[in-house]
Amino acid sequence: MPRRPRTTHWVRYISSVVLFFLLILQGVPASAVPMQNDPNGFEGIPWGATFSETDSFMKVQDAGQSQTYELKAGTPSLGPVKVDSMRFVTSEGKFARVTVRYQGKATHDQILAYLQSLFGPLDRTPGQIASGPVKFFSWTGLETDVKLRYEIGTNLGIIFFESQQLRRKMTDSSSDTVF
């Protein structure tokens, strides 16, 4: 009976070690924090509301079941913080998601403070905050999920405010709305 070469054992060992370190370097998602004040929508617009072009919103993308809108006037802001873009997404004509993009460490810190003031503080227990080149933060309510992803190396952030009920209907084929 032929004997396996010893290199197979070392290859497995080294592969396991490399995989372990790659997983650590990717950053571990922070646990979702229960949302203290679920807004059941975004800035006064309830999830599931009929949404169309108005004086305030213009359609920028139509993907059949999903339409994407942006604000017509001014620089978008999340609370007091100016952001690069804010897109409002519908599923079958019903308001379902907002995608916010921003850049810069100072902007990230302001947004994180603002979101914590709205939805509750993050769990600062060791091991609960993401480390590595990508940080994830999440608040989960009964009707709303808020997920923030921030890349330290590029200082780019993206936030999703989503209706839990309408999330399943969303088409994630559009790169503008994919996490």
Placement of each model-derived feature along the sequence:
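N-terminal secretory signal peptides that target proteins for export/translocation
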Residues: 1-11
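Non-cytosolic coordination micro-motifs
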Residues: 3-5, 32-71, 99-179
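Bacterial N-terminal signal peptides
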Residues: 15-26
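Extracytoplasmic
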Residues: 42, 81-83, 93-95, 134
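Short, surface-exposed beta-strand/loop micro-motifs that present aromatic residues
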Residues: 85-88, 148
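Coil-to-beta-strand transition motifs
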Residues: 91-96, 156
